[in-house]
Structure formats: structure tokens, C-alpha cells
Amino acid sequence: MTKKILLIEIGTEELPARLLSKISLYFYKNFIKELDFHNISYKNIKYFSTPRRLALKIKDIDITERFVEIKKRGPSIINSYDKDGFLTEAATRWLKHCGININQAIRLKNEKGEWLFYKTRKKQENIESLIPKITESALKNISIKKSMRWGQDNQKFSRPIRNIVILLDKKVIPGDVFNITSKNLLQNHLSLKDSQIKIKDAKDYPKILLEKNNIIADYFIRKEKIIEDIENIAKKIKGFIKKNNVLIEEVTALVESPKALLVNFQEKFLQIPKKILINTIEKKQKCFPIYNSEKKLLPYFIFISNIQTQESEKIIIGNQRVMHARLSDAEFFFKNDRKVKLESRLLSLKKVLFQNNLGSLYEKTLRIKLLIKWIAKYSSSDVEDSIRAALLSKCDLVTDVVCEFPELQGKIGMYYALEDKEKKDVATALEEQYLPRFSGDKLPCTLIGCGLSIADKMDTLSGMFYIGNIPSSDKDPFALRRLAIGIIRIILEKNIPLNLEDLIKKSLSLYNKKNEEDLILFDKMIKFFMIRLFHWYEETGYSAKIIKSVLSCKSIELIDIHKKIQAISFFKKLKDSQSIILSIKRISNILAKEKEKINGDINKKLMIEKEEIILFNNIEEFDNYTKNLFLEKKYNDILIKIKSFENPIYNFFKKVKIYHSDSKIRLNRLLLLSKLKKIFFKIADFSYLY
């Protein structure tokens, strides 16, 4: 077995920073799939990525000449020869298909009979000719939504590919990938893009890049170096860096030869609101702000350069100038905004379109005001404060700061509201209205914030359904699924007793749609929410069967649904709960056989067997015991009580003949079973649990 090191490096133009990790991981996984498909063994694979290269290093790849055994069974011997001993047409066709004569065929005999059989060994394609094909296939199968095309051949990838290296130990593997011939010249740093780095042996990768031009090809090593460097620099000025994994990942994907540099800015800029300052440094400039021990910003930031140079001072001065300009703009926008109060911007929203056919942001604000007023009755939040928050909710969208930094919407509204001496809960709600922003994000903390978030999201959902912008199976351009999950989470996790049906109807009514399409829209929205609810519970870890058993009962109160799902999950874990479920199944099967509806009241006088009387008494006792439990939605207690039916049901089926010769007695017993089924199905459709 011959084993060698295989190196593949794909030199590209600058890859998108936000996609670099995804692209490199897909390349790695796709390549492994290709190796497995071709039965090529190896010890391990390591992948590398920088903004201008994707690479794989495969250790101990087996390049031994390989053979595959081919077996082909032909027609049976009986069908292969005629009565005179000559080959039949079926046998002749099979021999021709195999490319052999009858002397090369053998006979395969077993207990079922005897057939013509052909067995041979075929040499597989040489691994050296396979690798370029495998590489191109692995790259082409990377799932990228947006790609670029280049060259006369109209090649397609995330960014144009400019260089290919395929090296097996010291040997260059000849072949083309994206019509680029492989060689042993690695793509150099962007500052030296006209020159290349010659690599003689695959084992030298990625060390040779570091030695020649300080390029760190390993994404994870590069990331750790950046973290270590910025922390050390911050310590030197008695500061620290707050963890920001998103920024770290982005910067790591932007550079391949990182060098951390300390840069200062004028202290006057510390008067700018902290969130504006941080946003400018982190989001706009991709730099790291530094904090003191009291978690206050220091007049410094750290910039990650993409080049190792002796002229660091020039880079520092350049970044100082750029940051000064950015912070000056932010300072100007902030001061300009504070010339007027936040509330005075309300009428300006009339000039801002919310969505085609849905009016302006001012009209949306008025709808939110009416909806939050209605929600406040259920959330126990202050009605006047809720209305105030609604009226201010979109005012920051026409401020200079938010126009320049859209990601600060809500945050700036809260800050300006506090400056205007608005109540703290009202101001906080302006930021909280956008929560949760993504899966697993935090929820609003204030009751007003919860109400405002629900009202805003529900108004958007209703509006989009109203104009037909409904998500399809693969497209959701307005992130309506996320909005629905946000509403669901707030109602459930904050225990707000909102009826989803009433909420949707109230929201739709604010669009003044009063015709036969009302019901169609409502049904579409309910279905949309129920699908989202199902998926959310499934992702949370609940059994799909349990979720379906509860949702199929058409309950629209989310808190009620939640309690039922929790209770059924609890019940399923109880000892012997399965026997009750099987009893319910038996009852359902008996009732399903009846062609006519089973209607009427149970007549105790028609009960002649002790076991049916005991079962009836148990039902009456259960109804009395659980009457208040149902009102209080104590489903755990109800299900525990349901377990008390286990023996009475068992004895009933054992001793009582349901299909009695007397039709009245038979009907009475079926009514008894029907009553039992209704008890169980008040909580969930147990047929999903069988």
C-alpha cells in the first residue's frame, strides 16, 4: 500500500468574509464524500482558508493501483442452450453485452439452479487523473446562493478562481480545474499578487506561506492569534476587549497576514452615546474598541492590518484619519438629531413608506397604537404608557443617526426617549420592540416592550398576508416566519393570556378589510401560525406525535396548547401510561365501526353488569373532580386522574359484552365508551399517541 501527502490549494479573488467559513467547510465535506465514493482511503484531512485561498491537506492518501471485481450473472443453463445444444438468443445477447465468448463464461450453481456467470477484475481509474475531477466536483457542489461568472468558458463560483495547486508529495498532478492547469506555484499575498510562492513538497504546506510572507493559512490559528494580540495590546494600556465573536470571525475572514495595531482618537468623541461610538468602531470600521476596568470606553481602538510591514506608523495614521472622519460624522448626526424631541418626528413618518399598498410608517404607527391598546388589557401593562410607546416606536427611523446606522433602530429611539425624560419603561420598549431578532435571541423584559413587539410583528404579518406577500416553501423575503416565532415565544415564555384567533382578527380588522376574503385571510394566517408552532416545538425537543395530538384539537390559546403539550409529555413518561393509551385505541376502534352517530344520554337503569356501573360511577366522579381542574388548566392533575380508569376499563372489556342482543343496552354501552373518549380527547387527540 503506497501512501502519500496530497495538497490542493485553490487561489481565488477575495472571497466574501461572511461566507468564508461556510465555503471552506463545504469544500472539505464535499471532498471527503468524493474520496469515499471512489473508495480512496486516507488518514486525515485538514482544511485551510484565507480571503484568497481554499486548501486541503490529505495525509496518507492511498494511491495504490486498485482493481474492482465485476460479477455478471447470465441466463439459466436451461435457457442458455436449445435442445440441440446450441446457444440460445438470450445467451448470445448476454455474451455480447459482457464482451466475452462462451469459453470465458463459467457456471454458477446453487440450490436454486444453475446459470451462466462471468467474473473479472477491472483496473480502476488512476488516482492522479481522478483528483482534478474530484476537486472540481467538490467545488461545484458547494451551495452558494450568489456566484460570479468569469472567463470565456463562463465558469461559476463565489469569486473567480485564478490559481490551482495539486501536489502529491513532490509531484505536480497534471490536470485542469475550472480550465486552470495545476502547478506547484502558490498564490501570494495580495500586496505581492504578481509573484507566486514555489512549493516543492506537499508536507511543507502551510508552513511555507508563513515563512515566505507571514500568511497564516489555518483559519483557526489565525483567529487565535488575532484574539491573543488584541488582548495583549489592550492590557498594555490597562484596558480589555469585550468578546465579540461575530467581529472576530469577520476580521479573521478579511485578513491572511494579521497584524494588530493600536490607534487612538480624540477624547471629545467619548461624549457621543456609547452605542453609536461602538457601532462606528465595530460595524463601520471592523475595529475593536477598548474598555477600562469600569467598562467605560477608552479613546483607543485596535485595527487588524492585513500586511506585515516596517511602516506600521503610516497604517496607524491612515486609520486614525478614517476613524476621525467617521466619528465626526456620527457626532454631527447626533447633535443634529438632538435639536428636536423624538415625539416631534411623528408626523415626518407620513413621508416614509412602510410597504407598497400598506401605507406610510405613520399609518403603521396608528395601527400599532390601536393594537397595543387592545393587547394591554391582557398583558396587564399600563394602557397610556403602552400607547405612548407605540406613538414613539418608529420616530427614530427618521433621525440622522438611524439613517446612517440602520442597525441602531430602537436603540437610538430608547436613548433619545430617555434624554427627552420619557418614562423608563416606555423608552426601553422602543428598543425591545425588535426582540427577538433571531432564533434563541433574548425577549423583551418589560410588559410594554412585550406588547409593542407583538403589535409591531402582528401588524407586519397581517399587512403582508393582506397584500399577498405570503412565504412559500423555499422563500420568505420578509422574514415572516421569524416574526411569527417571535410572537409565539413572547406569549408563551412571558405567559401572556392572548388568544391567537382574537389577536389575528383584531390586527386584520385594522386594515379595514370587510368582505368575504376576511375568512380566507384569517384561515391562512391561523394555518401559518400552527405550522410555525409545530416546528418550534419540534426544534425545542418535544415529540412530533405529542405536538400533533394537541394541535389537532384546534385550540387557539397558545398558553393552553403549551400546558397540554407539557402535560402529555409528562403523562407519557408515567409508568403504565401506555396501557391507558391502548385502552383509548380500543375504544376508538369500536366506535369507528359504528355506521350511525352515537347520540343520546347514558341511562343508568339499562346497566345490568356490575363492571359497567363501576365504570359509569368512575366517569361521574371524574367529571366532578376535574371540573375546576379544567378551568384552571391543571392538565397534569387531570391526566393522573385519567390513570384511575385503567382497572375499570380493563374489567369492563373483560366482563361486559358490548354488542348485547338488546339494541337499547348495546347503544347505552356505546354511549358509555363515547363519553370516555370525549374525556380523553378534551386534552388531546390520543390517536396520535398509539
UniProtKB/Swiss-Prot annotation:
Its EC number is 6.1.1.14. Keywords: Aminoacyl-tRNA synthetase, ATP-binding, Cytoplasm, Ligase, Nucleotide-binding, Protein biosynthesis. Disulfide bonds: none annotated. GO terms for cellular component: cytosol. It catalyses: tRNA(Gly) + glycine + ATP = glycyl-tRNA(Gly) + AMP + diphosphate. Signal peptide: none annotated. One of its GO terms (molecular function) is arginine-tRNA ligase activity. It is found in: Cytoplasm. Its main location: cytoplasm. It is an enzyme of class 6 (ligase). InterPro entries: DALR_anticod-bd (IPR008909), Gly-tRNA-synth_bsu (IPR015944), Gly-tRNA-synth_heterodimer (IPR006194). GO terms for biological process: arginyl-tRNA aminoacylation; glycyl-tRNA aminoacylation. It comes from the Bacteria. Tetramer of two alpha and two beta subunits. NCBIfam families: glyS. Belongs to the class-II aminoacyl-tRNA synthetase family. This is Glycine--tRNA ligase beta subunit.
